[in-house]
Amino acid sequence: MKARMQTADIRKQWEGAAPGWAKWEPTIATWMEPATSAMLTMADVDLGAEVLDLASGAGSQTLSAARRVGARGHVVASDISETMLQHVQENARAVGLHNVTTLAGAAENLAVTEATFDAGICRLGLMLFAEPAKALAAVRRALKPGRKIAVVVFTTPTNNPFMAKPMQILLRHAGKAPPPPGQPGIFSLGASGVMERLFLASGFVCVEQRSLAVPLRMPCATHALEMMREAFGAYRAVVSDSPEVVRVAAWKEVAEILKTFETSTGFEGPAEVLVAAGLKPP
């Protein structure tokens, strides 16, 4: 019951964030390009492959995968938000890609045929799933033997200060505690050893990992604030049930902390992600 409640809450928060995420998708795509490229390579996304993309969002990494696999390949974009998937379809049509289809639902309960996919990918979604181990196990069943999944997650609060400090501010104003270990959260899978243990517990082997610095560069802190308020569902959700006066005060303080990351050339937010991959045993 608890997992179902979490899933419903996650669906609600991302349906609400979908328009903002789609608006900022080009910025997010540029920001995460090094991580996306590494993820696709580590998952062995090659020409002609059948790829499952979990938590696709508006689909910039879906389209990157679709270009890699070519006309003989195929990418299934899956997301808990049907609105997100509408954006995936629109974005694919806009660039003339016809090898993308969508599948709505929580990653833990996807209706996919066993052993049909050559690769699985998930960029910045796994740490926010209600049951990440269950989601990975579902992907393992969907993969052909000897095939891989690769994911991107944020590492630690220390290495992602422009994201960690605003979250701390929002939680404090809302009177809420950070998610306890094992619960969905921005940094829940980023500590040393966590992803490897999760992959192994989910039945994967030959786990590979690499950390990447992915600083967010924008013209100014105001742009970073707008993106955070409009697109980051986990941040929006923290104060969504707070009185307006609390929300206003919280976001005002967030704006002030984001300004501390401005330089002479604009906003630069230090960020780090972990790209991890696991192999389904042959």
Predicted regions and their residues:
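Conserved hydrophobic residues forming the short capping helix/wall of the S-adenosyl-L-methionine
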Residues: 69, 91-92, 170, 199, ...
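A generic alpha-to-beta junction signature in SAM-dependent methyltransferases
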Residues: 43-45, 69, 143
